[in-house]
Amino acid sequence: MLGMEKYFINEDWSPLKVFINRPDGFRVIEEISYKPATEWKGSIQGKYAVYLLRKRGIDHFTVISEISKILHSKIHYIGIKDTNAITEQIVYTTNVKNIIEKYENDKFLLTFLGYSNSKFNHTGNIFEIEIETDDIKEFEKRVNKLRSIKYLPAYIGYQRFGTKRPITHIIGKMLVLREWQNAIDFLVGYPFESESELVKKARYAYMKGDLKEALELFPKRFRDERIAIKLLLRNENYFNILRNLQTPLIFYIEAYQSYLFNKYLSRIMDPTKIDENLVIKIPTSYDSCDSICREIFREEGLLNINFKIKELKLNVKDLVRKAYTLIRNLTIKDKKITFALDRGIYATIVIREIARTDPRLFT
């Protein structure tokens, strides 16, 4: 699923029933120079005004857009955090005059920390996850096994593809193939069982061609779906609709690259030959591929395709990523598993390896 074709630890583990109470049972703390962002101390002056953002159950782009309006400035960040979690991270702005000491609503808390003259060394993230399982002793045994191995394949986790609706990579593929209508159809249509009944009805209405009903049904937080439908009602073409979406289109293309990376990693990973410096490259064209990459590109129908979409002014870069990741400070106590991972590594790959079950149950 999502390119993750097999498990890493060579044990005949049966699936465990694992549940994580989202968002409250899943906490992510950004790590700055190997210390929690919550411990970062600012200076009394500097060219950046620095804030601690604590959010709960809200997606990254929505909260950044809201903060930008509150602070009347472009917001900079060093990592995109999980939507379905309680997360704490650094955000900063060059607007050092109009400081808001604290802002809070039901979704996020913004607290001014001070100033900085330099940007931040984002070393990773700390995860604190409360586990509910039918066999905690077996879960703890597997955690201890993982602690002895120390490494896991650096799969790109489920959040990158969408938690309730893991489809961002498919939209990305449609963009790469220049199939504009299909990209919009996958964005707005094709409901998943994990979605609410209201949203499923909205997507079904779109697929039936009832655009007005779909627009009425989609909640306001589904910004891009609503934008697409409104423009279709004005007879706008699909290419121009894509250009008007709020989510950056490169987000979808990078999700597709992530899917290809996972497929590649599944085919080369070996627990007996862990090379912590091994790097995998997913280039933007078939001609730049190695033999394994070419095999995957052929399977995906990408022989004469370039990921750099000039029509949309998207200068996509090669995806270069380490094959393996070190799991730091792994502990489990009172059904809470805690560990730190390097930047860009997803906690769900750790739980997936231990539980051997459908990650959508805990993503």
From Swiss-Prot:
Active site residues according to the UniProt entry: D82
One GO MF term attached to the UniProt entry: tRNA pseudouridine(13) synthase activity
Main function: Could be responsible for synthesis of pseudouridine from uracil-13 in transfer RNAs.
Source domain of life: Archaea
Record-given protein name: Probable tRNA pseudouridine synthase D
Family recorded in the similarity comment: Belongs to the pseudouridine synthase TruD family.
UniProt keyword terms in alphabetical order: Isomerase, tRNA processing
One Pfam family in the UniProt entry: TruD
HAMAP family with a match to the protein in the record: TruD (MF_01082)
GO term, biological process aspect, one: tRNA pseudouridine synthesis
Catalytic activity: uridine(13) in tRNA = pseudouridine(13) in tRNA
InterPro entries: PsdUridine_synth_cat_dom_sf, PsdUridine_synth_TruD, PsdUridine_synth_TruD_insert, TruD_catalytic
SUPFAM superfamilies named in the record: Pseudouridine synthase
Organism: Sulfurisphaera tokodaii (strain DSM 16993 / JCM 10545 / NBRC 100140 / 7)
Domain annotation TRUD: ranges: 151-363
Broad class of enzyme this protein falls into: isomerase
Enzyme Commission identifier(s): 5.4.99.27
UniProt entry tagged with the keyword Cell inner membrane: no
